[in-house]
């Protein structure tokens, strides 16, 4: 594969946290390379997009065609040299080949090569992100924010500012490359907010700063780029009014803390109505060092005119924590199917298990096939029984209602709560974590669900309106690597009529398969 020519110039912007980055898109190059970074004061080699971590913000407008030319310049011997990028939250209708999940939708991009992802944000707007979908590569740095703006946003009258300065990314950061560390790390070394943070026992390095002007209202876009922990997010002295979850508009809901899981996104309106001062932004991880001593797990909300110093504000007990069950979609709120459990065309109960090394769903641990599922289908294999990996493929017909339940017991899913992400769709959560109630009238709708803890039986519903193979997996990346996934093959017989990959896509597998093992 030859390299594609540069598709557009980068427009540099000064982010509110004081570092120069680049807002790019919807037509752009994205160069993946290795480089040393020290976001928390500790220097390590990482996987970078356009030389920065997190990767640059990619933006577009509702209905835009995204053409993102991914150039693989990876060379570090301790990390993978190939890559594959998933555009998290995009439906990819008609472009299943561009979804980016390695060995489900494509072969990886080999080092020294490039690949053009070409897809359209049809009827989609909101907060998205992109990340490597090859092994645990995104834990080493290949992750970044993505926003599709809606010129006719129904919530536009609720805020004054929505731009590059209102992005808030949360990342777990490890001082050891994923391939060299534990299979299941017990907490990260640090929490990074907009790419900056401190680690316990480390120096007082710079914290990210988000600057606001007193009296203005800001649409903050909060993204969890986490590989593992969930976070309890709050801003001292301020409430947050949620208006979006995972690129789905919801009725405004005011909270004072948000528990956010790997892969999830929220937009909330923050009104800068406090005294001119500095306020701690807090992201308490579910594992690792769970305090705020010395400014760890923190960033700074700074009012214009305040001194450039760390805040002195103190943490307060949350009295309005987000209850996911209280989120109501703004449009078409009803869940598909009949208003009772099992009232769908196909109901599937996912039985989890763990043997100390691998996770299992319905007695099968997912192992990536050598031939991508989409390529198998386009090559003529249309029976789920014949598709590989055997036992992990579930065929579902078109225009059907699907219900999935995730029962959690004391032994079947250690490391809970597990955030599960369905590619190619959003879904209605008719039973949320921590509840025995069901809601078929106006349940929260999103693309990553917290499946809860012991005794929970979280249940989701979606409609099969998007032909192709779609991953359903735990978004704790170390758990996905250990087999915690299945694939829905949706309307398999019609995939060849609705999906026409590019010639470059067809070249991916021969190029990748010809690599020496040292260049994978």
Curated annotation (Swiss-Prot):
GO terms for molecular function: copper ion binding; hydroquinone:oxygen oxidoreductase activity. Residues 24-149, 161-303, 370-491 form the Plastocyanin-like domain. Cu cation 2 binds at residues 88, 131, 475. It catalyses: 4 hydroquinone + O2 = 4 benzosemiquinone + 2 H2O. Its cofactor is Cu cation. Residues 1-18 form the signal peptide. This is Laccase-4.
